[in-house]
Each structure stands twice: as structure tokens, then as C-alpha cells.
Amino acid sequence: MSITAERKAALITEYATKAGDTGSPEVQVAILTERINNLTGHFKDHKKDNHSRRGLLTLVSSRRSLLDYLKKKDEARYTKLIGALGIRR
């Protein structure tokens, strides 16, 4: 259900705005999106796992907050990010 360290490192290098960047909204949203996609696949097999579903809703909420922040600060970066990740907003 969690993402591997190699996948997380690949996401960081792909969405980083500068070298060593792990805290930018783009990187955080990319990592959260990967975790959300993994959990969504988990629920196809485990429909009654309500404990993990609550965690999924928490992840979606924090991703939405980061996306709202990014849209408020720099709308061009926001539209580029949601296009790259394929997020419907």
C-alpha cells in the first residue's frame, strides 16, 4: 500500500523545482497522488476496509489543500502539475 523508496525518489527528481527539493508543493502532491492511486487499487479487492478508507480521505484532503495553495500562489505551475498528473480539477 505504501510506495517504495525508489519510486518516491523518482517522483522527487521528476517534479523537483531545484536540486534537493523535497518540500515543494509539486513534489508533495505527486507523492500524495501516488499513494492515493495505490490505495484506490487496494479498495478494488478490499471493499470493506473502512479504516484505510479514512486514511485515503485524509490524503485526498491534504492534496486538495496543497493544490489550493499552489493555485493561489502560482496558477501556471498549478495547471502544469494537474496536467502532468492527470488530476481532474
UniProtKB/Swiss-Prot annotation:
It comes from the Bacteria. InterPro entries: Ribosomal_uS15, Ribosomal_uS15_bac-type, uS15_NS1_RNA-bd_sf. The keyword Flavoprotein does not apply. GO terms for cellular component: cytosolic small ribosomal subunit. GO terms for molecular function: rRNA binding; structural constituent of ribosome. Keywords: Ribonucleoprotein, Ribosomal protein, RNA-binding, rRNA-binding. GO terms for biological process: translation. SMART domains: Ribosomal_S15. Pfam families: Ribosomal_S15. HAMAP family: Ribosomal_uS15_B. One of the primary rRNA binding proteins, it binds directly to 16S rRNA where it helps nucleate assembly of the platform of the 30S subunit by binding and bridging several RNA helices of the 16S rRNA. Part of the 30S ribosomal subunit. Forms a bridge to the 50S subunit in the 70S ribosome, contacting the 23S rRNA. Belongs to the universal ribosomal protein uS15 family. This is Small ribosomal subunit protein uS15. It comes from Agrobacterium fabrum (strain C58 / ATCC 33970) (Agrobacterium tumefaciens (strain C58)). The lineage of its organism: Bacteria, Pseudomonadati, Pseudomonadota, Alphaproteobacteria, Hyphomicrobiales.
